[in-house]
Amino acid sequence: MRLKPLIGVAALLYLVTCSSTLHAQAAPDSNDSATAAQAPATSAPSTPANDEPTPMPRVAPAAYPMQEGFIDSRGVLIYYMTVGRGAPLVIVHGGPGASHDYFLPYLLPLARHNRLVFIDERGSGKSQKLDDPAGYTVENMVEDVEAVRQGLVLGKISLLGHSYGGVLAQAYAFKYQNNLSHLILCSTFPSTTQMNEVFVKMKQKMSPELRAHIDAAEKEGLFGHGKDYEKNRYTNDYMIAAWGEGYFPYLYGNKPDPNYDPIAAGIVPWDLYREMWGSHGEFVIDGNLKSVEYVERLPGIHVPTLIMVGDHDECDPSLSKEMHEKIADSQLVILPNSGHMTFVDQQKIFTTSVIDFLHPNLQKRNAAKAGS
């Protein structure tokens, strides 16, 4: 799908510090917890010309500082990037093997209300690669998230996970629930067995020609074929068939990405991908993620939880409905005309749902203003 004992405080390595700043056009709500001090307004001219209107005072646009660096998680350097102010919202990506990049720029509106902490998981994006792929496990990545929380001294965090990142977020909640204030699970699954059943149904809905083409490639074996540069990954032909024709209808709805390229989607750390997802194709998970069977553990999650899914998501909405039934203090949002990339298809609905969930008092104040 493309897209241990508690450790001590991790050593924070500011190997890279970015001094750039993102600017918003409007200042954050002054009553919100994420509000920062505004720059002083400039004074209007005291004696304007008689034929000119008195200019309105100008307020400097709010600035949202961005910082990036690395946290040493038991010898593995984990990349992070933060933007915004307020209570921390840690965001983990899917793949496995993608990076935080695909969240941008879509999640930036959340920075007006929270300090966003994007993480590249071990082996992914800018984070350190491992010599031994056996170190790519959900359990190790849970410890990496905890290392970032400790290293940045974040205190309690809200945690948002998308796709495989949602699996990681569930696993973090099982072990470190006391460190969570909120949990957000987006387009994800609680059971590999159930997800593999979804893949069977996806294949059944393909045209006979496409299904036969994919089945033949998977039967032959997906690695060691094609041109020399293709031998350690899926061939271009298989990526086009699986990620292009097979997956694309489940990725987007309202706003398909015109730049989506199934071959570019294959730019992943293949040793990680094969270790976790498996080597037998896109429509079966048989790597170490086959151990993900969380359904019976979900009732143990007691933090407020928001579950979001597209109405024709690759991670079928039935999976999110079951998570909602199992987690007592949970809300379920099914985004209309949306596939797996809900925050692309329905950016406004997505970001508004997250903001309302994390800041219910802000929602009440806005409703009061609208009614006054």
Region spans (language model):
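Hydrophobic, aromatic-rich cap/lid helix
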Residues: A265-E293
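Short beta-strand/loop motif that positions the catalytic acidic residue
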Residues: I301, I307-V309
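Catalytic active-site module of serine/aspartate enzymes centered on a nucleophile-bearing elbow/loop
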Residues: S330-S372
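Conserved HGGG/HGGXW glycine-rich cap/lid loop of the alpha/beta-hydrolase fold
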Residues: V76-K129
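Conserved alpha/beta-hydrolase "acid-adjacent" motif
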Residues: E314-L319
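Active-site loop/oxyanion-hole signature of alpha/beta-hydrolase fold enzymes
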Residues: E121-Y164, T352
